[in-house]
Amino acid sequence: MDNTSLLTRGGEIYSRKKGKKQRLEEIVFDKEKRKEYLTGFHKRKVERRKHAQVQLEQQKREERLALRKSLREQRKRELAERLAFSKELNSSLENDEESSQQEDSSSKSDSEEESSMEPKTTEYDEDDKHVTVEIVEDDDDEEIAYPKEGFVTPRISPPPDVPLRPHKPKNAAKKKFRYESKFERTQDRRKEKIRRLKKKIRR
């Protein structure tokens, strides 16, 4: 080996190593995947749209479930309120019935006492006439104890009830039609239900 080859040997090794480092790897494309990517823009767009629709339907379903749950809870609350209200009405009606029974019993005892009282008789003597008057105290028209013998004043029947024609106002101002809000409609419905419940309970 001569001196020049020894001195230039390092340069050759360096150039070989440098060539290995700077050598670029070959890029190889998968033809099928490349073709699918380049021709599948519409397909991917449709898939994205379908995915968005599925998500939207799922969101709507969750909203419907939440709404049903809130409506169920609201109905339960309204039912509890109605039950409490009907219990109060029943208790008040029972109290009214008890008080009316007590009043009836007291009025019956009063009427019995009055009926036990003897009628007052007074006699009037004049020149040619002798008149006997019997006074009976009773509030009930149906239970008046008329004497069997003697004169009885005839009972005058009341005039028949003739329905009068209602007078219509000549210039009745028409009420303006106005749409009610949702809150007003719910309030009106509740009032109507309470009114019906009261009527049912009274029957």
Swiss-Prot record:
Residues 165-177, 192-203 have a biased composition (Basic residues). Residues 120-132, 178-191 have a biased composition (Basic and acidic residues). InterPro entries: Nucleolar_protein_12 (IPR019186). Its main location: nucleus. Residues 87-203 are annotated as: Disordered. Disulfide bonds: none annotated. Keywords: Coiled coil, Nucleus, Ribosome biogenesis, rRNA processing. Pfam families: Nop25. Residues 135-144 have a biased composition (Acidic residues). One of its GO terms (molecular function) is exonuclease activity. One of its GO terms (cellular component) is nucleus. It comes from the Eukaryota. Belongs to the RRP17 family. Involved in ribosomal RNA processing. This is Ribosomal RNA-processing protein 17. It comes from Schizosaccharomyces pombe (strain 972 / ATCC 24843) (Fission yeast).
